[in-house]
Each structure stands twice: as structure tokens, then as C-alpha cells.
């Protein structure tokens, strides 16, 4: 098979990375995508570093065996822990995702920037380095959100449970003083509407999906690996849980407006 005709692999600790996959499919509609969600082992954000590395390499091997031409690690935790190791071990373009702090700063809105993420993402050196770039000039506050990915893995993306979770997390803030909220986990875009409700739509909500998808397109173009023929690509979803419910939820989230 011509390398251009090979699919693009996507990986996340569960269904969250589908938020990034949606953006990539809009940007690259001719491409085929294979998505692997490791919901059996979700969430990654509370696991030990070595376990996250092992799970990430297992998922990557699964997709490599399917013949992918590029890999998107659509998981903030896996990116922060393993992206450098992956690039050293696999000879394909590998794109990661990180909290979109730079776009939030560049809005120049003043006020507080809140970064919602898993405890592990916030504890990793990669995030500390990102914070170091801006902490002297910006009011940035990390907000760990343990338990939120697990709710989304159950298909709970709206309603009282999500509202009350977010209401509790944001109760210590003055909504008028929040300029931006950075979604530092790929699960979180699915609860964006409830987040707007909780914060009275005062803050700009930013995630890294578009930036990651744009980088994927850039790398494929530079490597002459884009599909050229006029066609509509397809998306195939796999999950380590191997039950129909999680696959159905995955496609439901992919098609969610």
C-alpha cells in the first residue's frame, strides 16, 4: 500500500481523544482514521508514570500493527509522560497534545487563566516548563479535576452530576475575574456547554484540538503523506473494553454537535 493511503492512528486513555479526532477529520476529510481508546484502563491521570508508559506503548503497537502512517497521542497525560520515548522508538510522525496555554495568553484579556487537567498532567515536568514561560507575567491557576474523565467515560456529559461537579470546582472563583479556561484533558470539551453555564459564559474556553490537528496536517504535508484523491475518509474505532456500549458511545461523541 502507498504510504499516502495508509490511515492515521489516534490514541487516548478512553473516549476523550475523540474531541481531537473530530477536529482532525474536519481538517483532513480525505484521510482514514483509526482510533484506539483504552477505556479498560482509564483514567491515566491518576496512574504511576511507568504504568502510563507501558499502556501507551501497548496502544501504539496495536495501531502500528494496523499499518498507520502517523500517530496522534490525543491524551494530555500520555503526551506529557511518553511523547519523547515514542518519537525515539517509532519512525513515523508522532503528534502530542498539551494544554493550550499559549493561545489563552495571546488573547491578552487580563484576568485569571484557569487550567483544568488531570493530577498527573499538572504534576509532570512538561507542564512545569510550560508554566515557567508565562507565570511571571500572567495570573495562571492549575485546577486538578480527578474523577471528571471517569464520568465522561460513562457517557455523562451533561445534567446535574456534571453541573454539580463543576459548580463545586469553580465555587472558589469569581467568574467576573476569569478571563480564560484552558481544557487540559481531551475529555473536557464534551462538557463545555455545562462549563459555560456554571461560569455564566464569562470566560473564553480553549482546548488544544485545533492546534494539534493543524500540526498533524502540517507534518503530513511536509512529508508528502497527504491523500490526494477526491474521496471521503472513514473513521474506525477500537476500544480495549471490547464491548458494544463503549463503541456506540464513541461514535455518538464523534457525531455530537
Curated annotation (Swiss-Prot):
One GO process term, biological-process aspect: cell wall organization
Catalytic reaction list: L-glutamate = D-glutamate
Keyword Isomerase in annotation: yes
TM spans (from-to): none
Higher taxonomy: Bacteria, Bacillati, Bacillota, Clostridia, Eubacteriales
Protein name stated in the entry: Glutamate racemase
Family assignment from sequence similarity: Belongs to the aspartate/glutamate racemases family.
Binding site for substrate: 12-13, 44-45, 76-77, 186-187
Gene Ontology molecular function: any one: glutamate racemase activity
Keywords: Cell shape, Cell wall biogenesis/degradation, Isomerase, Peptidoglycan synthesis
Alphabetical list of NCBIfam families matching this protein: glut_race
Amino acid at each position: 500500500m502507498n504510504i499516502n493511503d495508509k490511515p492515521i492512528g489516534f490514541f487516548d486513555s478512553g473516549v476523550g481523544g475523540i474531541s481531537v479526532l473530530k477536529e482532525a477529520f474536519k481538517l483532513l476529510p480525505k484521510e482514514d482514521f483509526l482510533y484506539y481508546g483504552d477505556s479498560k484502563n482509564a483514567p491515566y491521570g491518576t496512574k504511576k508514570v511507568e504504568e502510563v508508559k507501558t499502556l501507551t506503548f501497548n496502544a501504539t503497537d496495536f495501531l502500528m500493527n494496523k499499518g498507520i502512517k502517523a500517530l496522534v497521542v490525543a491524551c494530555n497525560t500520555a503526551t506529557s509522560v511518553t511523547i519523547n520515548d515514542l518519537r525515539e522508538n517509532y519512525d513515523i510522525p508522532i503528534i502530542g497534545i498539551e494544554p493550550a496555554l499559549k493561545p489563552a495568553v495571546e488573547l491578552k484579556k487580563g484576568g485569571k487563566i484557569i487550567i483544568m487537567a488531570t493530577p498527573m498532567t499538572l504534576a509532570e515536568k512538561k507542564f512545569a516548563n510550560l508554566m515557567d514561560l508565562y507565570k511571571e507575567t500572567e495570573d495562571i491557576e492549575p485546577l486538578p479535576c480527578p474523577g471528571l474523565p471517569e464520568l465522561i467515560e460513562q457517557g455523562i456529559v451533561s445534567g446535574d452530576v456534571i453541573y454539580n461537579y463543576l459548580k463545586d470546582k469553580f465555587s472558589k472563583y469569581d467568574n467576573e475575574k476569569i478571563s480564560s479556561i484552558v481544557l487540559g484533558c481531551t475529555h473536557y470539551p464534551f462538557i463545555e456547554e455545562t462549563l459555560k453555564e456554571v461560569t455564566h459564559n464569562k470566560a473564553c474556553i480553549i482546548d488544544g484540538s485545533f492546534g494539534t490537528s493543524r500540526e498533524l496536517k502540517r507534518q503530513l504535508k511536509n512529508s508528502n503523506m497527504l491523500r490526494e484523491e477526491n474521496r471521503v475518509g472513514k473513521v474506525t474505532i477500537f476500544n480495549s473494553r471490547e464491548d458494544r456500549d463503549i463503541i456506540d458511545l464513541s461514535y455518538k461523541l464523534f457525531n455530537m454537535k
